[in-house]
Amino acid sequence: IKPACMPWGEKGGDGHGVNATNTIRAKAILRSITGNIDKIGGDQLTMPGDRGGTEDMNFNHNDLSQEQRDKMIGNERFPGLTFKGWDIISKAYPRFYPYSNAPLLFKAMITGEPYPVKACIVQADNPMLAFTNTKLVYEALKSLDLLVVHDYFMTPTAALADYALPAATWLERCSRGYPTMDVEQVSMAGSMPVVERFEGGTDVDFRDDYEFWYGLADRLGFGDKYWGPTMEDMMDGQVEPFGMKFRDFCEKVKYLKVPNKPEKYKEPGFKFLTPTGKVELYSTVIEELAKETGQDFDPLPNFVFPPDFPEVNPEYAAEYPLCM
C-alpha cells in the first residue's frame, strides 16, 4: 500500500520489553522495503533546512578523556546506549547522545559497584514514579550524598531531594517550537516570556533549564561552551541567519515556514545517517558492537521470548498456560 505511514505507536508502546529494539528496527526496515520513506503520505525525513544558526554549539563529548568515557555505567552490557555506541554512531550522526542504563545506575547508587555514585541531578523527570521497582529507586535515591531536583512541582522525588529548585514554566521562559513538520515544510514559531524577569535589574527565584545548566557550567569553567547566560542568548543564536534577534523574530515574524522537499534521498550526495550512508537492513553498528563486546547481538531483527514465558521458564506454564 502506497503511500503508507507506520506510526511509532501510542505512548511508545513498541519501545517496551526485551523485543523493543528489534520491533522498532523491523518497522524501520518495512518502511524502507515498501518504499514509504520521505514521501507525501509516507514517513517523513525532516531536515534542518535553511534555518541554520549556531544550533550545533553543543558540549563536545571529545572533551571527556577516554578514561572518563570508559567509566560510563552500562558500557559493556548496553553498549548501544553508551559511549561504546557513540564512538561508532557519532561518525555518521554527531548529535547522538549517550546515556547510562537507569536500573544499572540505581543499583550502583546502592552497592557502590562498579564505583560509588554519590550525587544526582534530576530534571524533567520523577524517578519515583517514572521507573518500575519503586522500592529500589527509593533506596537508591536515599543512598546519595546529594540529590538535586529542578521541577515545577514538589514531586515525590523532589520531596526526597536535598535541594528542590523551582523551574520556569512556559509562561516564564523563551520558547521555540515546530508546530508542523512534514515532507513539504518545517514550521518554526517562537515566543518570549509572558512574565518579564530581568527588567529593572530584578530577579526571581526560578530558572529555566538552560540557565540552570549554564550556571553550573560557568562555575565549573565551561561557560564558554554556551551562547551566553540566558535562554534568550541561545535563541539569538538560533535565528542568527535571519539577521535578527530572537525578540525581533517573536514580535515581527512569529511564525516561519521552511521548505522541506520530499524524496531527498534522490538528491546527489545525500546520505542517510548510518556508517554506510545507506538504509541499513543489516546494521553495521550492531555488527561492530557485537565484535567489540563479544556479545550475541544480531545485526538483523530477531524475536526473543520474554523471561516470564514458558519457553524460557517452564515453571510458569502450569500456572499461566496462555501467553499473549
Where on the chain are the PLM-derived regions?
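Long, low-complexity segments enriched in small/aliphatic residues
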Residues: N22, T54-D63, D70-M72, W86-I89, ...
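Non-catalytic alpha/beta scaffold blocks inside enzyme catalytic domains
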Residues: I1-I29, I33-K39, P48-R51, L64-P241
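Short clusters of hydrophobic/aromatic residues that line enzyme substrate/ligand-binding pockets
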Residues: Q44, R176, V194-V195, F272, ...
